Amino acid sequence: MDPALRSYHQRLRLYTPIARGVNLAARSPPLVREARAVVTPRPPIRPSSGKASSDDADVGDELIAIADARGDPPETLPPGAGGAAPACRRPPRGGSPAAFPVALHAVDAPSQFVTWLAVRWLRGAVGLGAVLCGIAFYVTSIARGA
């Protein structure tokens, strides 16, 4: 099982009050002691209507037990990966830098800068226009009899 998912299930198990009063926190310590999340216990859920009853209180524990019994999912790679090292990994120390070419993309920096300036100016103009409209509305309110 994924460690983050397992940690979520552990917290769910530790901080979910059970209607029958079983203290699961005493039986199962948290998996990751270094990075414990600050979680406060929530009030018990009392089923108000429908098919829910106190017999359904252990459904979460059953799901966690099934997940524990199945174990970790197999590592599956996307098609075409073929076990090759990902591009984000550092090259090996003995490897030559020519084996990892630097991706040089053409960036049209001046047009991006001009676009950024135009958008910023437009936002400022729209904001200033809104303020001036508000002032004009306030100033003319007496003449309109408002």
From Swiss-Prot:
Annotated keywords: Host nucleus, Phosphoprotein
Segments for region (Disordered): 63-93
Main location: host cell
One GO cellular component, as annotated: host cell nucleolus
Bias type Low complexity, positions: 84-93
Post-translational note: Phosphorylated.
Localisation per UniProt entry: Host nucleus, Host nucleolus
Source superkingdom: Viruses
Family to which this protein belongs: Belongs to the HHV-1 US8.5 protein family.
Protein name: Protein US8.5
Organism: Human herpesvirus 2 (strain HG52)
